[in-house]
Swiss-Prot record:
Purpose of the protein: Catalyzes the deamination of dCTP to dUTP.
Residues that bind dCTP: 97-102, 113, 155, 162
Similarity remark: Belongs to the dCTP deaminase family.
Paired cysteines (S-S): none
InterPro entries: dCTP_deaminase, dUTPase-like_sf, dUTPase_trimeric
Highest rank taxon of the organism: Archaea
Pfam assignment, any one: DCD
Protein name: dCTP deaminase
Organism listed in the record: Acidianus ambivalens
UniProt-listed HAMAP family: dCTP_deaminase (MF_00146)
GO annotation, biological process: dUMP biosynthetic process; dUTP biosynthetic process
Record-listed E.C. numbers: 3.5.4.13
Length: 173
């Protein structure tokens, strides 16, 4: 079941879903808009090969600021301004707001698991031309879905509680 605006307001009022900071204008008909945060990670251009065990920080440049330019075909990691906390019976789909998609930006399919909490780090692919984005701009849209029953294994992974743009944390198997 997708949560509509009335449901979302109720869940937020009860503290079952937490979005902080939250402004009422970001609650939409069937979801909540999230804003661009103050940090971005750019992939460094390098011939170095990433392999298991290497520190991923050597492959990124992290910038802090109030505005960022996403260059043509660039792949960046962007953090949301908001901290999100979901209960064990709600998950969310992350979508790019259509105005940014119409500029050619792209966000791959992304899910926020039931039980997750933290700022969201989202992959963004650049357009055919540079696009400037500003901190605080409504950029993403979260659509919340309630599961029929609480999940048996809520999210407790390595990205739980993340703050700021978060680089990959995994090992190849």
């Amino acid at each position: 079941m997708i949560l509509g605006d009335r449901d979302l307001k109720y869940y937020l009022e009860k503290g079952w879903i937490v979005i902080s900071p939250l402004t009422q204008d970001t609650i939409r008909e069937n979801g909540v808009d999230l804003r661009v945060g103050g940090e971005i990670a750019r992939f460094k251009k390098t011939d170095e090969i990433y392999e298991d065990g290497k520190d991923p920080r050597s492959f990124y440049e992290i910038e802090k600021g109030d505005e960022f330019i996403i260059y043509p075909n660039e792949h960046v990691l962007l953090v949301t301004e908001e901290y999100v906390k979901l209960p064990n019976d709600v998950m969310a789909f992350v979508n790019l707001r259509s105005s940014f998609a119409r500029l050619g930006l792209f966000v791959p399919p992304t899910i926020v698991d039931a039980g997750f909490e933290g700022q969201l780090t989202i992959e963004v692919l650049g357009s055919a031309f540079p696009v400037k984005i500003k901190r605080g701009t409504r950029f993403l849209h979260l659509i919340f879905a309630r599961t029929l029953t609480p999940v048996e294994n809520p999210y407790h992974g390595k990205y739980q509680g993340q703050q700021g743009v978060t680089l990959p944390k995994f090992k190849f198997r």
